[in-house]
Amino acid sequence: GPTGIGVLFGKKEWLDKLPPYQGGGEMINHVRWSGTTYNELPYKFEAGTPNYVGSYALSKAIDYIQSIDISSIAAHETQLTAYCEAQLAAIEGVHIYAADQPKAGAVSFNVYINGKLIHPFDIGTLLDQQGVTIRTGHHCAQPLIEELGVPGTARVSFGLYNEKEDIDIFIAALKKAIIMLS
């Protein structure tokens, strides 16, 4: 759907105390030399013209997810994650982080050839050239990556629209990338 939509969810007592991060539109009651008085919730955090298209799209996305049932989606992602881990574990030189631990639809890994770490960016680039998109880098968790002692990881993620065949395509592309780097 359209970009630029979000939801701020919190306790009223905290939201009342929280200042808005930007100003404009109906969020302000009064502006004076002595200070600004903000509108009541939720308007206090709605600067500028509301994103009507984004809010409609978000509403429809929520309806869609509710019609499927979030637990069914979670079960599907869990099955895909387990399948992917099994496929990755069968490839020599692939190190899976938190192998056999519960995960939420994503597997982080690195590739070693002859004991030498292949930079995850190189893996991501070669997969991209084959039409497979993964995420590489710190994943907004740089302290963890530093603790692991690696420059980053490769991460493959799954969602509602993925199937086992997508993982098979990813695994075939990864094997080809490893051969190219060997």
Residue ranges of predicted features:
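Pyridoxal 5′-phosphate
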Residues: 1-182
